[in-house]
């Protein structure tokens, strides 16, 4: 029993250290170009438009996660629920745009599933980078976007994009 308890404690500590190292690494390697570069072209270029929906989905999803895990808000907090809804709406929209505008196909279950497989890894990668940046901000001055003008602008643009698309 004692060995099982020691093993459990070591496993939890290693997992936490891995998670912290991963977050630090994500914060260091934040290399996303400003969202404004894509916003300018999004009305006339479908690739720029899908990039906006993927990036916005990722930013809003990672913001919800950061509010919960870094700021300690409960998962049923209205702010988190709103961000999660916008994240999922934009994520689903990315899949549909990918099928209809990028591939030029009529939406059905099969090509929707293929789109999820192609698009979701990008969203996950963006979420990792955004969360890393949010985590770095939180470590530096206990804020998420309050002192980060780029994330403020991108969050504002993403909420506006969601409002226009719904």
Task: Please give the residue ranges for each predicted region.
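Compact alpha-helical subdomains of small soluble proteins
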Residues: 90-166
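Short N-proximal segments of mature Sec-exported proteins
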Residues: 42-106
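Sec/Tat signal peptide C-region and signal peptidase I cleavage site
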Residues: 13-19
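Sec-dependent N-terminal signal peptides
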Residues: 3-13
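Short N-terminal segments immediately surrounding and downstream of signal-peptide cleavage
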Residues: 19-40
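Extended amphipathic alpha-helical interaction segments
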Residues: 34-41, 66-69, 152
